[in-house]
């Protein structure tokens, strides 16, 4: 259960003199969601940045087949050590998937969303996908259902999606130009025929646009995922953003290409690089004036379980969950959710109190800070235990989430690993400080030598970040 909000417990907050300049960026956006839309996504950790601090999700791997071959994808069905889309430890039948959901719904009552995202395409496996949704809708009606698709077969199944009360659909749409698509997709299999090059990309785009419009007409929320590929579609994504907004998508998730050679993808094996953090943020910021941007995506496995950034899938492998009795308890789950919502109200009040009276000043430099958090909107994790840092932009009057950055945790077997520490420093090198619940003297001193200050606290993220900024900016 998320802890209640308490008063400040900052144990160290004595930043050194401010340096000139800042991060030179702006994540602000004029796009806001209306109240009705916010209510629909309030407990969806993938669709709501605020909800992902409190609620968990899970994916079930019932859809192995795919009808397109993306150059950034290599599906794996028995892989436990890679964290990326298209990868699972094992495939499940719809009945096994439903059993797993009921087990986890009891073990992790803050799990509110069940998604099918692969490892292939859910709509290339319609019987397994919809059978799974039917079973879960019948046995766990409080769990939101969603799916992620390339969109090729979407127009044919929107009515079925609506019938099953699947309220959230994600389309992966990387381009609106078939010539660019020819560089991203090796082939597209449609109506028993395989198409290559721009012809295949054109067919895919037509169906994606049809599907997007059909979702809008059916009042089904649509998020669009786009993989940013430097030199191919990076300069084109602003056009994609404008088009999908016009067609009815409400959220755009621009993700970095994952292209490590060991993953075996075409792009990985041919040396296509992914974008830097700076390049990714630049494109996201360019698009943020048109529609709401998703910046908290973890590019999850197709069998992910738990809070975003906290994958617990290996706790629930088939050999384990099949031996567990379902513990789904609707009333208990509602009680947990009520507690979370009560805490969210307290957290909102605490944030408003922190931000009250903070006047926006254009001359204030913007800086980045890295946060070690286990969720709940708090600075509440030990530096050595963090497997990722959430990065926020601070300007003295606002604190805005920018991104998350994965790292290997520093403390392993009770000792700090030097190689791991060096990688952490590199990962957060553009941050003025790291905000943690606790940190040892040795890593604290090493961070300071690298130009990164530390703040030890257990409190609301915005409060700790603004307190640091005020002292940093005093000089």
Curated annotation (Swiss-Prot):
Known pathway: Cofactor biosynthesis; Fe-Mo cofactor biosynthesis
Q: Does the keyword RNA-binding apply?
A: no
- Residue numbers spanned by region Disordered: 1-25
Radical SAM core domain: residues covered: 52-303
Which molecular function terms from Gene Ontology are attached?
4 iron, 4 sulfur cluster binding; lyase activity; metal ion binding
Name the Pfam families for this protein.
Nitro_FeMo-Co, Radical_SAM
Which keywords belong to this entry?
4Fe-4S, Iron, Iron-sulfur, Lyase, Metal-binding, Nitrogen fixation, S-adenosyl-L-methionine
What does the record give as EC number? 4.-.-.-
Q: Which GO terms describe its biological process?
A: nitrogen fixation
Q: Where is the composition biased (Polar residues)?
A: 1-17
Q: Kindly state what the record says about how the cofactor is bound.
A: Binds 3 [4Fe-4S] clusters per monomer. One cluster is coordinated with 3 cysteines and an exchangeable S-adenosyl-L-methionine. The two others probably act as substrate.
Q: Which InterPro entries match?
A: Aldolase_TIM (IPR013785), Di-Nase_FeMo-co_biosynth (IPR003731), DiNase_FeMo-co_biosyn_sf (IPR036105), MoaA_NifB_PqqE_Fe-S-bd_CS (IPR000385), Nase_CF_NifB (IPR005980), NifB_C (IPR034165), rSAM (IPR007197)
Q: Which cofactor does it need?
A: [4Fe-4S] cluster
Binding annotation for [4Fe-4S] cluster 1? 66, 70, 73
Q: What does this protein do?
A: Involved in the biosynthesis of the iron-molybdenum cofactor (FeMo-co or M-cluster) found in the dinitrogenase enzyme of the nitrogenase complex in nitrogen-fixing microorganisms. NifB catalyzes the crucial step of radical SAM-dependent carbide insertion that occurs concomitant with the insertion of a 9th sulfur and the rearrangement/coupling of two [4Fe-4S] clusters into a [8Fe-9S-C] cluster, the precursor to the M-cluster.
The family line of this record is: Belongs to the radical SAM superfamily. NifB family.
- Protein name (record): FeMo cofactor biosynthesis protein NifB
Q: Which gene encodes it?
A: nifB
């Amino acid at each position: 259960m998320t802890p209640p909000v308490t008063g400040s417990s900052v144990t160290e907050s004595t930043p050194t003199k401010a340096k000139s300049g800042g991060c030179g960026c702006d994540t602000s956006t004029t796009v806001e969601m209306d109240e009705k839309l916010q209510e629909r996504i309030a407990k969806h950790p993938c669709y709501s940045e605020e909800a992902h601090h409190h609620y968990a999700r899970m994916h079930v791997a019932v859809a192995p087949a795919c009808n397109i071959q993306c150059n950034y994808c290599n599906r794996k069905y028995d892989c436990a050590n890679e964290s990326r889309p298209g990868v699972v430890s094992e495939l499940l039948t719809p009945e096994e998937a439903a059993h797993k959901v009921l087990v986890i719904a009891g073990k992790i009552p803050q799990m509110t969303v069940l998604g099918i995202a692969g490892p292939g395409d859910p709509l290339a496996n319609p019987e397994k996908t919809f059978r799974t949704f039917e079973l879960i809708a019948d046995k766990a009606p409080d769990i939101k259902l969603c799916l992620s698709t390339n969109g090729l077969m979407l127009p044919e199944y929107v009515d079925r999606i609506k019938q099953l009360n699947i309220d959230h659909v994600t389309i992966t749409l990387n381009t609106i130009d078939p010539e660019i698509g020819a560089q991203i997709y090796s082939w597209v299999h449609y109506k028993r025929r395989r198409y290559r090059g721009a012809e295949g990309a054109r067919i895919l785009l037509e169906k994606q646009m049809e599907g997007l419009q059909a979702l809008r007409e059916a009042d089904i929320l649509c998020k669009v995922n786009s993989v940013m590929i430097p030199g191919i579609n990076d300069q084109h994504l602003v056009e994609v953003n404008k088009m999908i907004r016009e067609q009815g998508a409400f959220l755009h998730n621009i993700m970095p290409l994952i292209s490590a050679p060991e993953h075996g993808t075409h792009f990985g094996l041919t040396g296509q690089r992914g974008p830097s953090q700076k390049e990714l943020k630049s494109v996201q910021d360019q698009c943020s004036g048109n529609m709401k941007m998703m910046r908290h995506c973890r590019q999850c496995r197709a069998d992910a379980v738990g809070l975003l950034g906290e994958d617990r899938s290996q706790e629930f492998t088939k050999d384990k969950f099949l031996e567990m009795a379902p513990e789904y308890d609707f009333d208990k789950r509602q009680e947990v959710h009520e507690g979370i919502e009560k805490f969210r109200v307290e957290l909102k009040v605490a944030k408003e109190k922190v931000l009250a009276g903070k006047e926006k000043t254009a001359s204030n430099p913007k800086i980045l800070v890295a946060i070690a958090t286990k969720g709940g909107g708090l600075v509440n994790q030990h530096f050595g235990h963090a497997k990722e840092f959430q990065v926020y932009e601070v300007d003295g009057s606002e604190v805005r989430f920018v991104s998350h950055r994965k790292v290997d945790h520093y403390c392993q077997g009770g000792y700090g690993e030097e190689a791991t520490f060096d990688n952490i420093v590199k990962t957060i090198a553009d941050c003025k400080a790291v905000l943690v619940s606790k940190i040892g003297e040795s890593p604290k001193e090493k961070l300071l030598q690298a130009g990164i200050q530390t703040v030890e606290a257990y409190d609301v993220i915005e409060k700790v970040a603004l307190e640091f900024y005020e002292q940093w900016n005093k000089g």
